[in-house]
């Protein structure tokens, strides 16, 4: 029986859209306020440091995806290079991790919808509806899912850049003083807090068998995704810290 494979019909742009859609989730809307409360203006450096450290993971995924351009990402890497038990557990860990991440994203999305549009809505119901809608979109097919992802990515980027650009005119350098009102102790815990904001680009490798010229486009897509995400995070958080707040003692920013 002949094996049924995937069609390579996804270019660099579509691969980047997958990466940005998975990486720039609701975390950028929910975490900066917690970060400001936790560490103050030093949060700008936290995002920069996390972006720098993530480069090493991104380079690993780039190299492995180019060498093993198979669907499955991390599972395929371990299956080809190690052994079946390791690949089995790797696949399950990815599945569990992504399921938990998607659950968190759906919850944050529901909280945002209720906060700004439907104050009387039920959070469990909104979370369930969000999960059902996006699951249905994925079942429609890759082409339809990419269209939805692209539209949502462009809207999200426009909102983030637009809001940050408006706040850019109100920047006050004095808000950087003191830079670390809570000290440097929370720096590493703060990096752990925002870690999930840098997770997602690895999903590009999961679609390796559908990407045209995977050896060239996958590494490019991964690094472009990480670069865009880091730049947007630093810009948005930097403007927020410099224009909206002045932290001289622990205070919580409401997002």
Which positions does each model-derived feature cover?
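Hydrophobic transmembrane alpha-helices that form the core helical bundles
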Residues: 34-38, 46, 55-131, 136-139, ...
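Membrane-interface "cap" regions at the ends of multi-pass membrane proteins
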Residues: 1-33, 37-42, 48, 54-55, ...
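Residue-level recognition of membrane-helix boundary sites in multi-pass small-molecule transporters
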Residues: 14, 42, 86, 144, ...
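Alpha-helical transmembrane segments and their lipid-water interface positions
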Residues: 18, 29, 54, 58-61, ...
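Hydrophobic/aromatic residues within transmembrane alpha-helices of membrane transport systems
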Residues: 11, 25, 64, 83, ...
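A short, hydrophobic C-terminal helix/tail in secreted or cell-surface proteins
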Residues: 247-255
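Helix-loop-helix junctions that connect adjacent transmembrane segments
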Residues: 2-6, 44, 48, 117-125, ...
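Select transmembrane alpha-helical segments in multipass membrane proteins
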Residues: 9-19, 45, 83-96, 130, ...
């Amino acid at each position: 029986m002949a094996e049924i494979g995937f069609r390579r019909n996804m270019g660099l742009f579509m691969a980047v859209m997958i990466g940005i859609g998975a990486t720039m989730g609701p975390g950028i809307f929910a975490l900066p306020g917690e970060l400001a409360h936790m560490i103050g203006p030093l949060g700008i450096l936290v995002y920069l440091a996390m972006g720098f450290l993530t480069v090493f993971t991104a380079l690993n995924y780039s190299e492995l995806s180019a060498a093993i351009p198979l669907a499955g990402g991390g599972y395929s890497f371990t299956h080809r290079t190690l052994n079946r038990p390791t690949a089995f557990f790797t696949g399950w860990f990815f599945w569990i991790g992504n399921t938990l991440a998607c659950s968190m994203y759906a919850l944050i999305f529901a909280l945002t919808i209720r906060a700004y549009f439907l104050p009387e809505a039920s959070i469990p119901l909104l979370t369930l509806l969000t999960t059902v809608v996006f699951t249905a979109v994925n079942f429609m097919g890759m082409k339809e899912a990419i269209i939805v992802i692209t539209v949502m990515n462009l809207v999200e980027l426009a909102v983030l850049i637009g809001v940050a650009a408006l706040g850019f005119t109100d920047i006050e350098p004095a808000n950087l003083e003191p830079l670390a009102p809570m000290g440097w102790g929370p720096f590493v815990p703060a990096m752990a807090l925002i870690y999930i904001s840098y997770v997602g680009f690895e999903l590009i490798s999961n679609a390796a068998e559908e990407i045209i010229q995977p050896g060239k486009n996958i590494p490019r897509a991964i690094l472009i995704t990480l670069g865009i995400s880091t730049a947007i995070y630093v810009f948005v958080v930097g403007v927020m810290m410099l224009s909206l707040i002045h932290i001289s003692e622990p205070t919580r920013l409401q997002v």
